[in-house]
Amino acid sequence: MRKDLRPYWLKRAYLACRSWYVDYFLRPECASLGRFATIMKPRFVIISGPNIHIGDCFTAIAEPMHRVEIGVWGREAGAGTIRIGNAVLMSPGSRISASDEIVIGDGVMLANGVYITDSDWHTVYDRTQRAEEPTPVHIANNVWLGDHATVLKGVSIGENSVVAARAVVTRDVPANVIVAGNPARVVRELDPEREMITRMDYFSDPEGQLRFFD
């Protein structure tokens, strides 16, 4: 890791500007955005649509060519919901698109390029029409979605499970497993008795974290 050679006052000024941008441009786009959010390069984070709720200790890492996008496009005005729990990580290029409901639990990690959707968006033969009814997506606590994984409509993913890189999840995933492939299938079971350290543990003292990294 390279040493930060910036003067301390310049670092503080940069962080203050970043917080200002989040508070004035991103927070108003959310129905709720919790405390201790860390949004890196917030100019490249796109939040749009109604009923977007984001919990505490949210982390988003965006890049100019790999934006982070959270959007609700309901079938009717004001419809559709996204609920993101506490201590969730969204990496560059990750996208969440809801027409009905997407619920993401605490401590979930989205790697680069992950896509989560609850709708097909368009019909196959008439591309001008919206698809059939969307189906909610529920992702439980401490799920890890690998690089460029895709989660499609109607899916539930159980607690602690891992979705491998580029997997396409088309059906429910039980808790404590690893799935891979297209369509995703179980390739390994995790030991539910083994201690698991989560992002919720990491952010158990968020104020202390801020002091540590200051």
Q: Model segments located where?
A:
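Glycine-rich NAD(P)-binding loop of Rossmann-like domains
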Residues: 77, 129-140
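Beta-rich strand-turn-strand
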Residues: 93-99, 147-162, 167-171
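Conserved catalytic-core motifs of eukaryotic protein kinase domains, centered on the activation segment
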Residues: 120, 127-129, 155, 189-190
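Short glycine/proline- and charge-enriched loop/turn segments
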Residues: 123-130, 195-201
